Amino acid sequence: MEKTYIGLDPGIEGFVTAMFPNGNYEFYSIDENDDLALNRILKSIKERSWQVTAVLEDVHALFSASAKSTFNFGEIKGILKGLLVANEIPYTLVQPKDWQREIWINQDMIVSYKTVIRGDKEIKQKVVDTKSTSINSARRLFPQIDLRKNERCKKIDDNKVDSLLMAEYARRKNL
C-alpha cells in the first residue's frame, strides 16, 4: 500500500505539504489559512488517500527567542497536533536535526566559521546555515517544484522548503 505523507512546519509563517503516492504535491501556508481551514485541508487529504501519515517538527524554545514568539510556536504546534488527532492522522514528532541529517548531503551544506574564545584559546567554530542548506537540498531533490510561497513572490520560502523536506523524510523512513 502506498501512503500519502504530510510534512508540517509549525510557525506563524509555517507550511503544510502533502506528498501523494501518484507524485502530486500540495502546499498550504499556515498564515493564509485559519484553524478551520487547516482542519478542512487535512480532512480533504485524508479522504483522498488510502493511508496517511504526518511528520510534525518538534520545535522547542530557542535561546535567543522572545517569550511571545516561543508561545506562538507552541500554540501553533498544539493546534496542528490537535487537528491531526481530530482527523485520526497518525503523526511523528521529529527534531529538526533528525530530518536534516537524513535529507542533507555534504554538497548541500552552506558553512561559515566564527571565532570563539574557549579558555585562553581562540578556535574557529563551524556554523551551518540551515535555511540555505535546506533550500539546496530541496532544489536537488525536487527541481520541478516551485519553492516560492506563491507565484507573486520572488524569494524561496524556507518554511515551504522545510515542510517538503519533512514529508520526504517521512517517505524515506516509511513512517
Q: What function would you assign to each model-found segment?
A:
Residues 1-175:
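Phosphate- and other anionic-substrate recognition elements at nucleic-acid/protein interfaces
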